[in-house]
A protein has these predicted regions:
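Non-catalytic regulatory/gating segments with a bias toward low-complexity or hydrophobic composition
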Residues: 57, 65, 76-77, 135-140, ...
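Short sequence motifs at beta-strands and strand-loop junctions characteristic
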Residues: 147, 175-179, 219-223, 276-279, ...
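Outer-membrane beta-barrel translocator/receptor signature
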Residues: 94, 108, 121, 130-133, ...
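Short acidic/polar hinge/loop motifs at secondary-structure boundaries
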Residues: 115-141
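Extracytoplasmic beta-strand/coil segments of soluble accessory domains associated
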Residues: 74-117
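N-terminal periplasmic "start-of-domain" segments of outer-membrane beta-barrel proteins
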Residues: 22, 32-65, 94-95
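Face-selective signature of the C-terminal outer-membrane beta-barrel domain
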Residues: 240-246, 290-318, 335-435
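Periplasmic-side early beta-strands and strand-to-turn transitions of outer-membrane beta-barrels
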Residues: 164-165, 173, 190-284, 317-331
Length: 435
């Protein structure tokens, strides 16, 4: 019995001594912190951090875009406050509104930069986001640094850098409602410590939602495809050359519009096309085709006390819009608009380095844009008979009835069953400004 008590007492003393030894061990001072992936994106014009700017900013990462199915700028309206881009018509309809400020025609009131290259014309704003790394949306005027077209705000789109990510991305999507399908493949390769590149392409298609009640065909079908090459070369420690080139092509219906009836002031009871009110029933195919080519070179030189950036961009847009302007099963008139747009831009920026107490930025920017537009209106058989002959002859008849003694009976007969009213416009634009 005494032996058992002695053995138990010895075990307890040993356990107490071991516990004291553990407690006297020095604590580990190494902290382990789990952080998410960090992406560093530099801008030629900002000298500080984006979150420190005195303006309202929304940032969308690639994860945010994937989680919310953000494939174009039109989808951003569901996430960013005070941002609205109407999702109707074709990709030609690309008006953007921030805080209610926007422009439906002519030059936009919201600027767009893709990899620090400005997109001057809003006809090019709607494109696919298959290889986008991040989107920055700055709400409020940004004209001090970015000049014209930024009264409402600014959108900056950044593609993924092949230096920060290597691998191959494959994306496939399919939807049953409109038979929507999309596929994209992009390869990112770091050749060495001085050179990296990425190359990829995408396809997107949809059968549409709206049917033409006249022939049963869907009128908002869409096919699109394109590709982009991005290359970065570091010839020295303080020199960087960033080159991008890309092309997008889309062919779509895009105009599921319908006739709404006679406007106020007309005889609505005797409406001639009453059976077609509220129905998509035009007899001509409404289509929009666009080819968009973009290329740019960003040269950055880091001196001891400042950073010099020179960004050169070129854009070519060639499109064709054909629309049945009467939206009826009769042949009244159509319009065919073609745009041929070329834009070359240059921005040279000097700015201080971020480790300096006094932060400054200055530079000069400019662009030249030449736009050739043709927009002929074609009056068809019913348009010649009803709109031209009918209206003129009704006017002649009214004049004769008002004063039959002094005015003879007159009438007009148009021999051609179709009349083409041509329209051709050249719109060159040049702009330059220091900042």
């Amino acid at each position: 019995m005494r032996k058992n008590i002695l053995f138990i007492t010895s075990c307890l003393l040993a356990a107490t001594t071991f516990a004291e030894d553990i407690n006297t061990l020095p604590k580990d001072t190494t902290k382990v912190i789990d952080i998410e992936e960090v992406v560093v994106i530099a801008s030629p014009k900002e000298t500080g951090k984006l979150r420190e700017l005195p303006t309202a900013v929304s940032l969308l990462s690639q994860k945010d875009m994937q989680a919310n199915q953000i494939t174009t700028l039109k989808n951003v309206s569901s996430l960013v406050p005070n941002f609205f881009m109407p999702d109707y018509g074709s990709r030609l309809t690309s008006a953007i509104y921030i805080r209610g400020i926007g422009s439906r025609i002519n030059t936009p009131a919201v600027g767009l930069y893709v990899d620090n290259i400005p997109y001057i014309d809003k006809s090019a704003f709607d494109f696919n986001f298959y290889d986008i790394e991040r989107i920055d949306i700055l709400r409020g005027p940004q004209g001090t640094l970015y000049g014209r077209n930024t009264m409402g705000g600014l959108i900056k789109v950044h593609t993924r850098s092949p230096f920060s990510y290597q691998g191959t991305d494959v994306k496939l999507s399919y939807g049953t409602k409109s038979n929507y399908r999309s596929a994209s493949l992009t390869h990112y390769h770091r050749w060495s410590d001085c050179f990296a590149f990425s190359a990829g392409g995408y396809y997107e298609g949809s059968d549409g939602f709206f049917r033409n009640s006249l022939n049963g065909k869907k009128v908002d079908n869409m096919e699109a495809g394109g590709g982009r090459i991005h290359a970065i070369w570091l010839p020295s420690e303080n020199l960087k050359l960033d080159f991008t080139i890309g092309y997008d092509y889309n062919d779509e219906g895009g105009y599921p519009y319908y006739y709404t009836g006679a406007i106020d002031g007309y005889d609505k009871e005797n409406e001639k096309y009453k059976n077609y009110i509220g129905k998509i029933s035009y007899d001509q195919d409404c289509t929009y085709r666009r080819g968009l080519f973009n290329t740019g070179l960003n040269i950055e030189y880091q001196a001891q006390k400042f950073i010099l950036s020179a960004v050169t961009g070129f854009q070519n847009l060639n499109d064709r819009m054909f629309m049945d302007q009467d939206f009826l099963p009769v042949s009244i008139y159509t319009i065919e608009q073609k745009q041929r747009l070329n834009t070359i831009s240059e921005e040279i920026t000097f700015k201080s380095k971020n480790n300096k107490r006094w932060q400054w930025v200055t530079g000069v920017s400019g662009f030249y844009q030449w736009l050739h537009t043709t927009g002929p209106v074609n009056f068809m058989e019913d348009g010649v008979t009803d709109m031209i002959e009918g209206n003129i002859n009704n006017t002649f008849k009214k004049i004769h009835l008002d004063d039959p003694r002094r005015t003879p009976e007159m009438s007009l007969d148009v021999l051609n069953n179709r009349i083409r009213v041509s329209g051709s416009f050249d719109t060159p634009v040049f702009s330059t400004a220091p900042f």
